[in-house]
Amino acid sequence: MTQRIAVLGATGSIGDSTLSILAAHPEHYQVYALSGHGRLDKLFELCQQFRPSRVAVPENKVDDFATRLAAAQIACEVVGGQAGLDDIALDPQVDTVVAAIVGAAGLASTLSAAKAGKRVLLANKEALVMAGSLMMQAVRDNGATLLPLDSEHNAIFQCLPPQIQQNNTAIHDASHGVKKLWLTASGGPFLNKTWEQMQAASVSEAVKHPNWSMGQKISVDSATMMNKGLELIEACHLFDLAESQINVVIHPQSIIHSLVEYCDGSFLAQMGSPDMRTPIAHALAYPNRISAGVESLDLYQLSSLEFIKPDLKKFACLKLAREAMQSGQAASITLNAANEVAVEAFIKQQVSLTDIALINAQVLDKMLGKDKSVAGHAAISVRQITELNDILMIDKIAREQAQLEVMACRN
């Protein structure tokens, strides 16, 4: 039976990798819908190649894009904005939603897909970082299937007992014997650099990842290890564990993608070449397997596998993420929002790479009431989050505060 796939965030790196696999297996998959935001020329080319039934673009681009498709004789419904993304996520013709929109912009459509009981292939970290409780509740209440695309979470999923994978049973049930999860991190381009070298780093240096080909924002997050911090928060929600049960270890070779430690002393690890097509192919085909077009590891050529404890002074963002998870959902929302603003400012060369952690810390302190100079925000730390609007309110305030911190760094 052919799966009808909606790829939300089709023009990004995850979208690229996903569509390459879908193109290689037309007998299994039909590209039913696509979405794009800034790279509409590329989205048009994808529409030419895959001939989707529906496509989502920014609200102010709907008419122009529809005219362009019609001129090319491509029969495709064009929908716009957040409402369009949600409508595709809810479309009864869609079997699987690939949630690959970067940042908070992908939150609402991912939540909509879960509420519609879809099979959701999750690459959007914010769905769990910002709305972990709401997202997992929506999955449970509506019979949705949630499969992680992050290489680390996908690796952990593969190393868990089948009854946890297939029945969504509690990972902390003693009978399963799971003791800890280990998230691996490459250490990024500054693993062997000093803090001072990080402070002076250019944007081009920060986005030059040693092992992975990724988008600009996630590459900067990898350089500061905020990416791993967000993945830690994500893993807590995805696998229903406390942050104390999840360790982070730097593994520069990026061959082991994560590990599960069991109570009998066993460690199960998932290994493979550092290529996002592997976890994407796994999630698309689960519980079966398909070719991902990835070259196999040559075990004879692996001279060593290193494991290093992270330096939390140099990679302060990782420490902030763990503290945010301890403080509750509002802190995670705040940290994610502040980080998006700070990373954008770094990419625009308005702040330094090391300013990102400083901005994040200051926004957390002020939003959660630790810094009394910002009146009225202390209640956010204990605010009950029951709906998407609560999340968006905290996100908005945190972004405004982060913009003030960026301005302070520039002065």
Swiss-Prot record:
GO terms for biological process: isopentenyl diphosphate biosynthetic process, methylerythritol 4-phosphate pathway involved in terpenoid biosynthetic process. NADPH binds at T11, G12, S13, I14, N124, E126, G215. Mn(2+) binds at D150, E152, E231. 1-deoxy-D-xylulose 5-phosphate binds at K125, S151, E152, S186, H209, S222, N227, K228, E231. The keyword Transcription does not apply. Transmembrane segments: none annotated. One of its GO terms (molecular function) is NADPH binding. It catalyses: 2-C-methyl-D-erythritol 4-phosphate + NADP(+) = 1-deoxy-D-xylulose 5-phosphate + NADPH + H(+). The gene is dxr. Its EC number is 1.1.1.267. Belongs to the DXR family. Catalyzes the NADPH-dependent rearrangement and reduction of 1-deoxy-D-xylulose-5-phosphate (DXP) to 2-C-methyl-D-erythritol 4-phosphate (MEP). It comes from Psychrobacter sp. (strain PRwf-1). It holds the Pfam family DXPR_C. InterPro entries: DXP_reductoisomerase (IPR003821), DXP_reductoisomerase_C (IPR013644), DXP_reductoisomerase_N (IPR013512), DXPR_C (IPR026877), DXPR_C_sf (IPR036169), NAD(P)-bd_dom_sf (IPR036291). It is an enzyme of class 1 (oxidoreductase). Its cofactor is Mg(2+); Mn(2+). This is 1-deoxy-D-xylulose 5-phosphate reductoisomerase. It comes from the Bacteria. The keyword Oxidoreductase applies.
